Amino acid sequence: MSVLIVGMSHRSAPVSLLERLSMDDSVRGETTQALLGRASLSEALIVSTCNRLEVYTVTSSFHTGVNDVVEVLHEASGVDIETLRGYLYVRYADAAAEHMLVVTSGLDSMVLGEQQIIGQVRTAYQAANEYGSVGPALHSLTQTALHTGKRVHSETAIDDAGASMVSFAVDRALVQMGLDSEAEAPLSGKTALVLGAGAMSSLAATHLGRAGISKLIMANRTLERAERLAEHSLEAGVPAEVVEYDQRASAYNRVDLVVSATGADDFTVKPEDIPEGASLMLVDLSMPRDIDDACADLPGVDLVNIERLHKASREGGSGMAPSEEEALAIVREELDSFTSEQRIRDIVPAVSALRRQAASVGSDELDRLRQRAPGISEVEWGEVEKTVRRVVDKLLHQPTVRVKELAARSGSISYDSALQELFGLESLASTAAPATTSVNASELPDAGIVAFVNAPSATQTRE
């Protein structure tokens, strides 16, 4: 049984496809149960964000597991299987562990080192726990990934700038407004309308406040949540008010920016609602999108959304910063520790079985001896039993210790080397010429897995 990841992200798929696979809590729960309904899959956890959809599962069969996950995604999203195969990537066993550590550390995010992803992975884990779909394998891997993410953020300077997708979006909006995002208060004298009152909206309000916004207007379907967000802004020293969600369009003519992060079923901002001649900067932080793209066709109206942010991130620099190198070193360290522990854990059942078998053989031989030598006194018999058990324990002690040490290492070992290592034998010099074997690559069976796009790993340079 090994961990399998099947997913797609901003690196492998267009936003339009990511939108179709985006899952709310209800769909994620249904999809998780559908995954567990497949015989090849025993655990399941789904990470669904604006920039990625990844299924983490544990499978008894790689090929069957991949096909089962793809079929479930097809059933959940309505996207045909061939389209999915063209954009999905696959990670398995150690590569799957590495991928989760890289993702949770923010090293595969659209904004390098962004902190939101660690919370999103934690939320996905908590949801899977509630569904009863997390077992020992995903529990251990997720906890290691979360620990690694915390180390990356606390031990490196990767998030010194407080980068997140929200800050990236607001900074892009400032540039398009002709404002200097590096200035102390570039939004001084400006007013913004924030639609939604969840985590993304709260982050947006915070970032707008840091950028010197003069006033915030909040609107949300649940009025109390909008009022609570406004109170937080007031406590931070930013003037704020609340408008009814259905009356949000009435605020368009008195704001400079509209930031939307509601995840609504319908567009929150439509072209017909924008007053003629209005000058607006629209920022859409939702997936699927909140703001109708057609709004950007209106004179004086500009738009930043997830798709445009993807394009901007691809146009950014490609060099690796020192903090990224430090972060990758932490990932490698944690990955080595995790994979070693997993290999040791995997060998424990075999070691236990070996000890049980040896104990059983010893007991059987003692029974035979007792029948053949009935005249042995109880005191003498007690010494015989102790001696036999000591011999068995001494014979097995070094092999069981060494097999765990060998299991912790990656790579393979020859049979004669294994015997020498396990039992502490002297090197067996052989005068015979070593046997050689050749393999014709063309004769190897076709792997037959779905197509996948390479994503950066802890041993690769970020795009």
UniProtKB/Swiss-Prot annotation:
InterPro entries in the cross-refs: 4pyrrol_synth_GluRdtase, 4pyrrol_synth_GluRdtase_dimer, 4pyrrol_synth_GluRdtase_N, GluRdtase_CS, GluRdtase_dimer_dom_sf, GluRdtase_N_sf, NAD(P)-bd_dom_sf, Shikm_DH/Glu-tRNA_Rdtase
Keyword entries, A-Z: NADP, Oxidoreductase, Porphyrin biosynthesis
PROSITE patterns xrefs: GLUTR
UniProt EC number: 1.2.1.70
One record GO biological process: protoporphyrinogen IX biosynthetic process from glutamate
CDD domains: NAD_bind_Glutamyl_tRNA_reduct (cd05213)
One Pfam short name: GlutR_N
Reactions listed under catalytic activity: (S)-4-amino-5-oxopentanoate + tRNA(Glu) + NADP(+) = L-glutamyl-tRNA(Glu) + NADPH + H(+)
Entry binding sites for NADP(+): G196, A197, G198, A199, M200, S201
Listed SUPFAM superfamilies: Glutamyl tRNA-reductase catalytic, N-terminal domain (SSF69742), Glutamyl tRNA-reductase dimerization domain (SSF69075), NAD(P)-binding Rossmann-fold domains (SSF51735)
Chain sites annotated for binding substrate: T49, C50, N51, R52, S109, E114, Q115, Q116, Q120
UniProt keyword Membrane present: no
The keyword Thylakoid appears for this protein: no
Pathway(s) where this gene product acts: Porphyrin-containing compound metabolism; protoporphyrin-IX biosynthesis; 5-aminolevulinate from L-glutamyl-tRNA(Glu): step 1/2
Gene3D superfamilies: Glutamyl-tRNA reductase, N-terminal domain (3.30.460.30), NAD(P)-binding Rossmann-like Domain (3.40.50.720)
Positions of the catalytic residues: C50
An example molecular function term from Gene Ontology annotations: glutamyl-tRNA reductase activity
Residues with site note (Important for activity): H99
Subunit structure: Homodimer.
UniProt miscellaneous comment: During catalysis, the active site Cys acts as a nucleophile attacking the alpha-carbonyl group of tRNA-bound glutamate with the formation of a thioester intermediate between enzyme and glutamate, and the concomitant release of tRNA(Glu). The thioester intermediate is finally reduced by direct hydride transfer from NADPH, to form the product GSA.
UniProt comment concerning the protein's domains: Possesses an unusual extended V-shaped dimeric structure with each monomer consisting of three distinct domains arranged along a curved 'spinal' alpha-helix. The N-terminal catalytic domain specifically recognizes the glutamate moiety of the substrate. The second domain is the NADPH-binding domain, and the third C-terminal domain is responsible for dimerization.
The protein's name in its UniProt record: Glutamyl-tRNA reductase
Lineage, opening ranks: Bacteria, Bacillati, Actinomycetota, Actinomycetes, Mycobacteriales
